[in-house]
Swiss-Prot record:
Membrane topology field: Multi-pass membrane protein
Residue ranges of the TM segments: 12-32, 79-99, 111-131, 151-171, 183-203, 234-254, 262-282, 301-321
PROSITE patterns to which the protein is assigned, alphabetical: COMPLEX1_ND1_1, COMPLEX1_ND1_2
Name of the featured protein: NADH-quinone oxidoreductase subunit H
Species of the source: Aeromonas hydrophila subsp. hydrophila (strain ATCC 7966 / DSM 30187 / BCRC 13018 / CCUG 14551 / JCM 1027 / KCTC 2358 / NCIMB 9240 / NCTC 8049)
Family affiliation: Belongs to the complex I subunit 1 family.
InterPro entries (alphabetical): NADH_UbQ_OxRdtase_su1/FPO (IPR001694), NADH_UbQ_OxRdtase_su1_CS (IPR018086)
Claim: Transmembrane helix is one of the keywords in the record: yes
The protein's assembly and partners: NDH-1 is composed of 14 different subunits. Subunits NuoA, H, J, K, L, M, N constitute the membrane sector of the complex.
Amino acid sequence: MSDSLIDLLLEIGKALIVLVGIVGAGAFMSFIERRLLALWQDRYGPNRVGPFGLLQLAADMIKMFFKEDWIPPFADRRIFVLAPIIAFTAFILAFAVVPITPTWGVADLNVGLLYILAIAGLAVYAVLFAGWSSNNKYSLLGSLRASAQTLSYEVFLGLSLMGIVIQTGSFNLRDIVEAQAGLWNVIPQILGFITFLFAGVAVTHRHPFDQPEAEQELADGYHIEYAGMKWGLFFVGEYIGIVLISSLIVTLFFGGWHGPWLPPFIWFALKTACFMVFFILLRASLPRPRFDQVMSFGWKVCLPLTLLNMLVTGAVVLMNAQ
């Protein structure tokens, strides 16, 4: 067997391991969310299936698998089926350039940040396809809300990272992590971190920025007509998006795998888990604002913060260069 074939098989195996880990983390987060919400609300939560309710996730997956695969009679069948597939795969593909350890990662691209922003933007098409193809007014309104919110906050998501690019001089995520060996970016880039955090919550449509799925207004939004495994793809895709944003926060602002004593993978996993719990805490503690307030907050607060961060970072870099 040639060396090139062995290298190819190793890369495929590495990609499969990362894929299984990402999907497993996203699915397991749904269980952790239910348990933590129950703990904070002084109730039990899922605790009947398996020890401590750990097999509840498997029971839910079996239930979704055997549910009727129903498509509305007036829906556009092809686009209706395509939408959840895009939603599920977009965030998974973005993980290809996230460096987990100094030696572990699927791909090492010099334009890694641009790749993530471009791939994550594909999720907008999934939302639009789902709302339009369902032939349901609530689905359409939810998809319009989601697309407007996502497109707006992706602008702030990208601009909040320009300070890091100016500071490190690279779009490569591995170079950005290596540059944080002495000082994490969250300290000099505190404005960028705050804006990225707000934008990340909005892009993943998580509470309190979950207006596209507001049950009281839109009856669960753009995936109201979905059931079974199609709904499951949307569901797991949302949690994979949370894992992606949490890992990006760790990679870009909190030193990635850097940390004392413990192995790099453990540090990366612990930091990512902390921000995943933070997402759950937001759902448990904050009310949902109106949609116009969410959009106004983005353009009137997040945009000026990102521009100010870019201006200050550029000025500091120029002063240090002289």
